[in-house]
């Protein structure tokens, strides 16, 4: 999309490289999309889920902050690759896996972003329909149907129009949701029982780590596979440090405050904490006066839609990176259609939300954690910009397949799945096959989700050890990066 075209013109770019004349913005501009996508009332639900690990209020506070910041730091580091190659994340990963081999992580990314889009859109639909019912404007299935049409429709429009409209929308969403969220904090303050904070007993180290890894998987690790999609329009002389800071800060700051406030509410109201599993946003709304339900719904739905919009856009790019020959707009529309099916299933046919959600996060979180570790290592090792032409040529410097990368991915995934367990989703009972080393599936370490962090470390360490030579050969005759 050229700089001369208006915000409401449809983006023409697919997975091709952004040309020099089309590059624009500064690292600080990354604050808006990442803040908007993460200023979601849904984040407060993690306060209740964190306490569900059987840890104290202060343990949960520390673990959630650490999990949020570290996971989004990974997003910030991966975002550097966007301005180095000016192409989508799943195109840039071809330098690691090969032009043809990168179709595997592209497929994983497509599934992951689709799952996240369904999760966020479902929560937005539940929030909107719950408010419609509480205001007496409808009951039964009608509010859910109307909410689905409204939410999905807006997500599709933004996803189809593309990058410029998304960036403008995120700036507006940031301001609106920020103001209304402050209002929620003020109105909810009277429902906090500060004496209950110290009444929750401390938990074990495995429980603390389980909380931290769950938060990492639910926040930053859910965004790593699309990080470069939103930095790819930046000029190549943009500051690496600025990209990392503004991405990490923008994505983390709202979540830190929202989760902490959610912890305060959850520790003060056991019934609300229990109801979060079925209707995360609706449970939090139970403490509000009726007159504030509309503003609350606006901030809840806008925050969730912001994340859904980014997922819809990046999901289309991942599909194109896989090799599907479609216009980007058609790919975005196809993603939206699949999202509708997912939303209908979760909203009308699933008894609980958190069980399938945790199962999805854990299962796909493991291979994506391996990939994230590998990509972070690539960014650290690589000192020069990508050869953009070779990213599209299987016979170029990046080759068609990279056996080392797949070996690391397979080893990390197999070991990672062996160290995670999810009792809330029966279809994942096969996981945790390596936990017998540390007490079995019923032991104290079972709920720690060690597999996620082990997978991340294997991806990072494996690439640092075994892929330095490959990267050195790839960039031997390339010019030095501008920044």
Language model features by range: what are they?
Residues 1-58, 207-214, 232-242, 470-483:
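Membrane-interface "cap" regions at the ends of multi-pass membrane proteins
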Residues 23-27, 161-174, 225-257, 272-283, ...:
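Hydrophobic, small-residue-rich membrane helices and short re-entrant helix-turn-helix hairpins
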Residues 27-44, 185-191, 201-265, 287-312, ...:
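Hydrophobic, membrane-embedded alpha-helices of multi-pass small-molecule transporters
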Residues 39-43, 66-74, 109-120, 154, ...:
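Selective recognition of specific alpha-helical transmembrane segments in multi-pass small-molecule
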Residues 52-53, 80, 96, 104, ...:
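Membrane-water interface regions at transmembrane-helix termini and the short interhelical loops
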Residues 63-97, 107-121, 464-471:
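Juxtamembrane transmembrane-helix boundary signature
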Residues 146-188, 201-204, 245-247, 357-365, ...:
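Membrane-interface loop-to-helix entry segments
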Residues 176, 372-461, 476-480:
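C-terminal membrane-solvent junction of multi-pass transporters and transport-like membrane proteins
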């Amino acid at each position: 999309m050229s700089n001369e075209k208006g915000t409401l013109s449809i983006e023409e770019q697919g997975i091709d490289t952004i040309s020099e004349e089309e590059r624009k913005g500064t690292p600080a501009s990354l604050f808006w999309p990442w803040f908007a996508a993460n200023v979601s009332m849904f984040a407060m639900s993690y306060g209740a889920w964190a306490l569900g690990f059987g840890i104290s209020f202060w343990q949960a506070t520390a673990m959630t902050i650490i999990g949020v910041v570290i996971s989004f730091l990974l997003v910030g580091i991966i975002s550097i690759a966007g301005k180095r190659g000016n192409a989508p994340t799943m195109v840039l990963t071809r330098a690691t896996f090969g032009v043809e081999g990168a179709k595997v992580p592209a497929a994983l990314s497509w599934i992951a972003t689709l799952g996240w889009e369904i999760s966020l859109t479902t929560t937005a639909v539940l929030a909107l329909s719950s408010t419609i019912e509480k205001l007496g404007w409808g009951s039964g299935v009608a509010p859910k149907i109307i909410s689905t049409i409204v939410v999905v429709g807006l997500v599709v429009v933004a996803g189809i129009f593309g990058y410029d409209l998304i960036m403008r929308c995120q700036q507006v969403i940031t301001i609106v949701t920020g103001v209304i969220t402050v209002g929620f904090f003020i109105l909810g303050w009277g429902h906090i029982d500060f004496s209950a904070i110290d009444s929750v007993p401390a938990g074990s180290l495995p429980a603390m780590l389980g909380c931290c890894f769950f938060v990492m998987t639910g926040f930053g690790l859910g965004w790593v596979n699309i990080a470069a999609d939103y930095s790819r329009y930046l000029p190549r002389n943009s500051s690496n440090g600025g990209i990392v800071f503004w991405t990490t800060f923008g994505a983390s700051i709202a979540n830190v405050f929202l989760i902490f406030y959610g912890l305060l509410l959850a520790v003060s109201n056991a019934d609300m904490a229990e109801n979060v599993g079925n209707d995360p946003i609706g449970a939090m709304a139970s403490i509000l006066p009726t007159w504030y339900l509309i503003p609350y719904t606006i901030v809840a739905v806008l925050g969730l839609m912001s994340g859904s919009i980014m997922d819809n856009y990046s999901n289309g790019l991942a599909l194109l990176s896989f090799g599907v020959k479609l216009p980007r707009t058609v790919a975005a529309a196809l993603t939206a259609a699949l999202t509708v099916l997912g939303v209908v299933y979760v909203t009308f046919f699933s008894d609980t939300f958190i069980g399938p959600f945790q199962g999805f996060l854990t299962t796909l979180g493991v291979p994506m954690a391996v990939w994230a570790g590998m990509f972070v290592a690539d960014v650290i090792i690589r000192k020069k910009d990508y050869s953009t032409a070779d990213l599209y040529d299987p016979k170029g410097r990046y080759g068609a397949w990279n056996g080392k990368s797949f070996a690391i991915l397979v080893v990390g995934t197999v070991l990672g799945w062996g160290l995670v367990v999810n009792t809330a989703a029966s279809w994942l009972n096969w996981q945790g096959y390596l936990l017998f080393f540390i007490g079995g599936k019923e032991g104290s370490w079972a709920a720690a989700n060690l597999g996620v962090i082990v997978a991340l470390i294997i991806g990072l360490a494996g690439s640092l050890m075994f892929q330095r030579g490959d990267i050195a050969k790839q960039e031997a005759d390339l010019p030095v990066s501008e920044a």
